[in-house]
Amino acid sequence: MTSLNTKLPINELKAILEAMNFFAKVSVGKVEDLVTETTLPSIYVTLDSDINENNGQMRTDGGEYNRILIVTLQIHLDQTNEDDLYYLDVRDTVESAILKDSLLWQSVIDRDVVGSRWDKGQNLPRKQGEMALRLFTRGCVV
């Protein structure tokens, strides 16, 4: 069985977010608490789960599977000098960067944004949100 390195698509996503030149911190490590976060704006990439799905292609060495990675982006913002809906502009900018074709996408053959949710403003002017993504890669042959 041959398989794809799961780190590769996560690193590609991290590179896309860094190339935006918007976030002061792009991390695949431990998610900081919004209240104690010292570097804003920041974004954290977390792999929630992965699924291998038969894509119907049969080869001489077995069936081919696509891998779908379910990823959460946690976004921390400071809206001190921004309007109340600034976080929606950030959300749209992140979504556009992810969906735009780029040479930085190497192993990811498709991607989509499933949705987002945001806090209710209890820590204003700081704002926290999450975006859920699906990254599709050519997975493995079994």
Placement of each model-derived feature along the sequence:
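Low-complexity, acidic Ser/Thr/Pro/Gly-rich terminal tails and inter-domain linkers that flank the onset
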Residues: T39-S49
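Charged, amphipathic alpha-helical segments and their flanking helix caps
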Residues: M1-V35, S49-V142
